[in-house]
Amino acid sequence: MLILPIVKGEYKKDYNLKHLTWFKVGGNAEIFFKPLDSEDLKSFLIQNKQKLPIKTFGAGSNIIIRDGGIEGVVIKLGQNFSNIEFIDNHLIVGSSCLNYNLAKFCQANAISGFEFLVGIPGTIGGGVAMNAGAYGSEFKDIVVQIEAIDFAGNFLTFTNEAIGFKYRSNNLPKNLIILKVVFKINKGDSENILLRMNEINNARSSTQPIKERTGGSTFANPEGHKSWELIDKAGLRGYRIGGASMSELHCNFMINNGDATAKDLEDLGDFVRQKVCEDSGVKLEWEIKRIGRHP
């Protein structure tokens, strides 16, 4: 018998995750949990005596939920984890804050260095987790430290150095939930910041299928290469499996054309990896996370 910890937040059983993801595919979460605050989350983790499997969920922008759904508990940090505040010449930002919202906040307050976030879908926590980057900047360039909690309910702090940022990854422990991120502040000019953000938005809209059901870059760029060029060279621009295809506009983006399953998307990605390796000898690595069970 499944016994859930007593919490102040909200549980939902057999919860459909499809509508929360940008791809609009996937199965259900066995248990979906939105904690009220960090203490509520800590209480849940300490009480999790059955050691229910735990997955965290952000904005759903860079993830494929498999069609068989997710066993155990999916934890989503809500609005109570999205605050932005100034403390001692630093920005303290809740991990569920959207990258776009932080970029707009910084522009309004003449804080430079965050312009690139306007072009990165997802949350601050997710951005740290994958060292997201675009247009010449990455999270490693602006993060001072993070505050997190492990699955045993211990609050932990990691400095930039301890995070161990790498290209689209880091050295953080796996069983960790990021709660807050501390950023350094560099003052700038609001008008110049806005101009740069507009440049980034214009570049995105002209080169990426931002109005489609997509999950951002499918594969990380291998050293010395650009994934889209390798995919294009292999003749896979627009290639389709079921309801999923590689974008004609930017062939490192996968698209749900309306009736794709998670299996279609994952099969397409694996096929592209195979063909690129056969064509160029380069092994593409997934940038999009794939989690959950196969049906």
UniProtKB/Swiss-Prot annotation:
Keyword terms, alphabetized: Cell cycle, Cell division, Cell shape, Cell wall biogenesis/degradation, Cytoplasm, FAD, Flavoprotein, NADP, Oxidoreductase, Peptidoglycan synthesis
Domain of life (superkingdom): Bacteria
Pathway(s) annotated for this protein in UniProt: Cell wall biogenesis; peptidoglycan biosynthesis
GO biological process: cell division; cell wall organization; peptidoglycan biosynthetic process; regulation of cell shape
Role of this protein: Cell wall formation.
Domain FAD-binding PCMH-type: 24-188
InterPro entries xref list: FAD-bd_PCMH, FAD-bd_PCMH-like_sf, FAD-bd_PCMH_sub1, FAD-bd_PCMH_sub2, MurB, MurB_C, MurB_C_sf, Oxid_FAD_bind_N
Keyword Transferase: no
GO molecular function, one term: FAD binding
Family of the protein in this entry: Belongs to the MurB family.
Protein's UniProt name: UDP-N-acetylenolpyruvoylglucosamine reductase
E.C. designation(s): 1.3.1.98
Intrachain S-S bonds: none
Catalytic activity: UDP-N-acetyl-alpha-D-muramate + NADP(+) = UDP-N-acetyl-3-O-(1-carboxyvinyl)-alpha-D-glucosamine + NADPH + H(+)
Active-site residues (renumbered): 168, 217 (proton donor), 287
GO CC entries: cytosol
Compartments it resides in: Cytoplasm
Top enzyme category: oxidoreductase
Chief location: cytoplasm
Cofactor(s) it depends on: FAD
